[in-house]
UniProtKB/Swiss-Prot annotation:
Species this protein is from: Treponema pallidum (strain Nichols)
Gene: mnmE
Subunit structure: Homodimer. Heterotetramer of two MnmE and two MnmG subunits.
Residues binding K(+): N233, S252, V254, T257
Species classification: Bacteria, Pseudomonadati, Spirochaetota, Spirochaetia, Spirochaetales
GO cellular component terms, A-Z: cytosol
Protein name (Swiss-Prot/TrEMBL): tRNA modification GTPase MnmE
Cofactor(s) it depends on: K(+)
Family from the record: Belongs to the TRAFAC class TrmE-Era-EngA-EngB-Septin-like GTPase superfamily. TrmE GTPase family.
Residues reported in the UniProt entry to bind GTP: 233-238, 252-258, 277-280
């Protein structure tokens, strides 16, 4: 069933929590008769039908005279609910059988099974949420980092809706001024020279900034895969654990301990990272380890960024130089065991790695509170020795003391994105929103150009009306059935 075909007169029900063993499960209902229908199988029927909005009731779900589960009901009265309708949420124990039994009782009492996104559609239909806040619900569910979660909450609270509403009011006021000049011209000229088109520029700039923020946050949406590579016993697994803040990989002084690759999620300043620890790169007669090496090579070739690990105590090996010469993806050379290295060892490693680094800069701080010029190393390519390649960086770290990890994160962010992203700034929440804002910007820029080239005010007003249409489509004030269908089918059942 498509969103615009939902039967709004039906009472609907859905299981709102994951259907798996858990402490609690929620069965969600909505509709004009939802309270009475739930009362028909609730032990305190009269108390439920008389309950005020936002009231909790404790009791039993009954199948005839048989008790099904001890529950708590949360009662909503229209219009003070998510959907704008009467609604009851049944909070039961989280066993799969129990939740299904309660759900089946709802269906038996005349509730219809809700479709994908139908609760949210009713919220939109009854004016409880605009489309930006509806989309924020799914963004909140999909958020993989704290920054994404905070941006979704910002949208859910109505910040984007309010921004677009303010822009719309300003555009309407400006358009009304132009309309007045057209309807009541002071002379025979269609164009009136005292119209200050500069008033339009701040509005265009605000929309441009929303568009730019969406483009700047591409990595926040797509995420990146960072693969740790290097020779056996270089310290890959130790660094993997240090970055995660937990012991996920087995660490041993025995070379070849890691035979298969491990993966874990990491939040890199708002960018979701899939971090991979791999088997050490070397020629081996062990068939199992050899398979691990092949997988490591494949993962390194397909990475968005490589952390190539070198044991600072062992120095740079021929195998390290071979890999650094051939690697074609963004790469950070990470020298480990920095807490155990002498100054001469640091200098030797820096000199050996220098020809392979095209982007200088990195910290080789010996400890978190180390000071002094001797504790820093800069690596930069020599003239004629650095070929064109993907961006690279060089950091010395200690997985034991965590010295240098902040520098590693900062350099990685710089390689992938070019610097820190101000995630607290309001942005757009979906590709649909980006397309509409981009269209609005183009319409307003066309209006500015039309006025500058001496076209009549009618042409300018036409462009303003087009921009207003796109702003209205963004919040849902104007919409088509196809847009609603595409948006609400992305939401899960129970949303």
């Amino acid at each position: 069933m498509r969103a615009h075909e939902y039967a709004l007169d039906d009472d609907i029900v859905a299981i709102a929590t994951a259907l798996s063993p858990a402490a609690l499960g929620i069965v969600r209902t909505s509709g004009s008769s939802s309270i009475e229908r739930v009362a028909s199988f609730f032990s305190r029927a009269q108390a439920l039908t008389r309950a005020r909005a936002h009231t909790f009731l404790h009791g039993w779900i009954l199948d005839g005279k048989t008790r099904v589960d001890e529950v708590v009901l949360l009662v909503y009265r229209a219009p003070h609910s998510f959907t704008g309708e009467h609604a009851v949420e049944i909070i039961c124990h989280g066993g799969v059988r129990t939740v299904q039994a309660v759900y089946r009782l709802c269906l038996a009492q005349g509730f219809r099974a809700a479709q994908r996104g139908e609760f949210s559609f009713r919220s939109f239909f009854h004016g409880k949420r605009d489309l930006t806040r509806i989309e924020a619900i799914q963004s909140l569910v999909d958020a993989r980092t704290c920054a994404a979660q905070q941006q979704a909450v910002l949208h859910l609270s109505g910040a984007l809706q309010q921004e677009i509403a303010a822009l719309t009011r300003a555009l309407l006021a400006f358009s009304a001024t132009l309309q007045g000049e057209i309807e009541y011209p002071e002379d025979e000229e269609t164009r009136v020279h005292d119209i200050d088109m500069r008033e339009l520029e701040p509005l265009v700039e605000r929309l441009r900034r929303l568009r730019a923020c969406w483009q700047e946050r591409a990595l926040q949406r797509t995420g990146v895969r960072i693969v740790l590579g290097g020779c056996p016993n270089a310290g890959k697994s130790s660094l993997f654990n240090a970055l995660l803040g937990q012991d996920r990989a087995i660490v041993s002084s025995v070379p070849g301990t890691t035979r298969d690759w491990l993966e874990a999620d990491l939040d890199l300043s708002g960018i979701p990272v899939r971090l991979c620890d791999t088997a050490g790169l070397r020629v081996t007669d062990n068939p199992i380890e050899a398979q691990g090496v092949v997988r490591s090579e494949q993962l390194l070739q397909g990475a968005d960024c490589v952390f190539y690990i070198i044991n600072g105590r062992a120095g740079v090996q021929a195998a390290d130089c071979a890999f650094l010469s051939d690697c074609a993806v963004p790469l950070v050379v990470v020298v480990t065991h920095n807490d155990l290295m002498s100054m001469s060892e640091r200098i030797q490693v820096c000199q050996a790695v220098q020809p392979f680094i095209s982007a200088p800069v990195l910290s080789c701080a010996r400890s978190q509170d180390a000071r002094g010029a001797g504790e820093q190393c800069l690596a930069g390519g020599k003239n004629g020795e650095v070929r064109d390649r993907a961006p690279r960086a060089f950091v010395c770290v200690s997985a034991k003391t965590h010295a240098g990890l902040d520098a590693l994160r900062a350099q990685t962010l710089h390689l992938l994105h070019g610097g820190q992203v101000p995630y607290e700034e309001l942005s757009l929440g979906s590709e649909r929103q980006y397309v509409l804002v981009d269209a609005a910007v183009q319409a307003l820029e066309h209006a500015q150009e039309a006025y500058a080239r001496g076209f009549g005010l009618d042409a300018v007003v036409h462009d303003l009306e087009e921009a207003l249409y796109h702003c209205g489509a963004l919040t849902g004030e104007v919409h088509s059935e196809d847009i609603l269908d595409a948006l609400f089918e992305k939401l899960c059942v129970g949303k």
